[in-house]
Design a protein with these regions (language model features):
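Sequence/fold signature of self-assembling virion shell proteins
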Residues: 2-37, 81, 150-174, 199-309
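Alpha-helical scaffold segments that mediate packing/assembly in large oligomeric complexes
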Residues: 100-178, 305-309
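A general structural signal for short secondary-structure junctions and capping/turn motifs
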Residues: 42-46, 177-184, 189, 219-221, ...
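Structured, hydrophobic secondary-structure cores that serve as assembly/anchoring elements
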Residues: 48, 81-108, 171-202, 207
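Assembly/oligomerization interface modules of large self-assembling protein complexes
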Residues: 30-92
């Protein structure tokens, strides 16, 4: 047996160098799907203040009708309610030293940019999702044959199942009776957690049919009963209900949530301090999201949230 050994540094181990792989691996990211459904607010922008006001007009106070020849035409009115969208600063940063940048075997700024981009996408999509989910009209999947609805901002029952085709029909039909307008493709949309739609895949139309409808949404998994379904894993819970096994979902039509942008999200490189030794990279945005219709004040909604006590 030889006397020079790899296992002992002084006898051979010092003759080798470990190598660092140049392939950097990152943690898997959530699927962020809500922001693509926000409508841009053209009144927002730079030098226009941090808030956009928007008016909502009611129907006429009393409907018109037939007239007697000698009567005057009745005089009615409508009411105006006003909503607002507030833009807020968002951001995060990672500082680093010139020394680590200079001596590292991989590109420190590039890894920082990737980590910040991932954070930026999660944060902004969650901000958009909050506006979709903060809603007065709630549907609870009591079981696969029964859907319980509440309109005061809280679920009225505990979920006992994930959505079935029957529950979807209940929700879509309720959206129609609530006069929720369909989106520009003449369909409703649903962003759903993984558990909430696991029972629907047998009912989705063939994907080949979907391609004839135009571009698919990011994360779109199927269509059923006039509603297009998108799966997300960033914001909605998969642990609702009595057994903690059931998922949340959000159904919506047109004009649900608006997005106002003064400064779109961007990566910024900080000005070095301490004679170049103190450096940093950040992401920053000045923008905001706002649900348009509030059932408690407007008497209408554009969103139904699937949730549970």
């Amino acid at each position: 047996m030889g006397q020079q050994l790899f296992a002992t540094n002084s006898l051979g181990g010092y003759l080798t160098n470990n190598q660092l792989s140049q392939q950097v691996r990152y943690l898997a990211q959530t699927m962020q799907r809500f922001r693509q459904f926000c409508d841009p607010e053209p009144a927002a922008g730079t030098n226009r203040g941090n808030k956009v006001l928007f008016n909502k007009i009611s129907n006429i106070s009393t409907a018109g009708g037939t007239l007697v020849e000698t009567d005057t035409i009745p005089k009615r009115n409508y009411t105006i309610t006003q909503g607002s969208l507030t833009m807020t600063e968002y951001g995060n940063s990672i500082p680093f030293t010139q020394k680590v940048k200079t001596l590292a075997d991989i590109q420190v700024p590039e890894t920082i940019r990737t980590v910040l981009m991932n954070d930026m996408k999660v944060v902004l999509d969650s901000a958009a999702a909050t506006q979709f989910k903060t809603n007065d009209y709630i549907a609870t999947i009591t079981n696969t044959a029964t859907t319980t609805f509440g309109s005061a901002g809280a679920a009225l029952a505990t979920a006992g199942a994930n959505m079935s085709d029957k529950n979807v029909r209940d929700i879509v039909d309720r959206m129609k009776t609530l006069l929720i307008p369909k989106r520009e493709d003449d369909n409703y949309s649903c962003v759903a957690s993984t558990n909430s739609i696991r029972g629907l895949y047998d009912f989705f139309e063939a994907k080949a049919q979907l391609t004839t409808l135009g571009p698919l949404y990011r994360g779109e998994v199927g269509q059923y009963y006039g509603c297009r379904f998108v799966e997300e894993t960033n914001f909605l819970s998969n642990t609702d209900g009595s057994d903690g096994l059931y998922g949340e979902a959000v159904f919506f039509g047109a004009d649900a949530v608006r997005e106002g942008i003064a400064i779109p999200e961007e990566i910024r490189v900080g000005i070095p301090a301490d004679f170049g030794r103190d450096q940093g990279i950040a992401w920053y945005a000045l923008l905001g999201f706002q649900q348009v219709w509030d059932y408690s004040t407007d008497g209408q909604t554009r969103i139904i949230v699937v949730d549970s006590l």
